[in-house]
């Protein structure tokens, strides 16, 4: 079903690329100002009908931060690396439901607390209805993500930088 655009809504960008976008927004505490993107020609035209196989995209963040992202159905990409002015950190694996392992440029161990993100989100939704309060994952966040995804697809189609106006 993941290779059927009608059912899935898109390819790896929609399926797993969203995790890259959310990680960048979370780590920087900001929303992208603009995007550029490229889609690699599919390797199997019978398999990848109407969906991309691999997408490279760049998120331009405030303060000159550039996030270089890649998502694919044919490559196993499961890491996140952040280069900072004073070093780097990485999660590898980054998107597993099980254990996460963080490495840092200074070699200091870093424990990553594991929680069930789905349980946390479902509990928040139930509590928000019960207590008439906002959920931790708002509709605004989902709207933001869809605007970014649409801009990435536009950048792939046009080959141009797409500015975002997200409020």
Language-model features: locations:
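Predominantly a Rossmann-like dinucleotide-binding segment in NAD(P)-dependent oxidoreductases
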Residues: 1-47, 159
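Soluble or luminal CAZymes and related metallo-dependent hydrolases
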Residues: 16, 117, 144
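NAD(P)-dinucleotide binding in Rossmann-like oxidoreductases
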Residues: 39-41, 45-54, 60-122, 166
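C-terminal helix-rich "cap/oligomerization" subdomain common to oxidoreductases
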Residues: 62, 110, 127-167
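A general structural signal for well-ordered alpha-helical segments in protein cores
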Residues: 20-21, 119-123, 149
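Generic structural signal for secondary-structure transition and capping sites
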Residues: 29-32, 66, 87, 134, ...
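Short amphipathic alpha-helical segments at helix-loop
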Residues: 4-9, 106, 110, 134
């Amino acid at each position: 079903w993941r290779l059927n655009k009608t059912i899935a809504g898109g390819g790896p960008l929609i399926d797993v690329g969203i995790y890259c976008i959310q990680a960048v927004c979370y780590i920087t505490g900001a929303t992208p100002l603009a995007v550029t993107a490229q889609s690699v020609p599919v390797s199997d035209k019978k398999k990848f009908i109407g969906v991309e196989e691999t997408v490279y995209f760049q998120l331009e963040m405030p303060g000159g931060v550039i996030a270089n992202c890649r998502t694919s159905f044919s490559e196993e990409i499961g890491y996140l690396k952040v280069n900072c002015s004073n070093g780097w950190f990485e999660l590898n694996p980054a998107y597993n439901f099980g254990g996460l392992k963080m490495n840092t440029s200074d070699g200091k161990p870093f424990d990553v607390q594991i929680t069930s993100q789905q349980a946390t989100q479902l509990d928040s939704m139930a509590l928000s209805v019960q207590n008439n309060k906002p959920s931790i994952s708002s509709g605004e966040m989902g709207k933001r993500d869809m605007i970014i995804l649409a801009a990435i697809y536009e950048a792939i189609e046009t080959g141009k930088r797409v500015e975002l106006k997200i409020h």
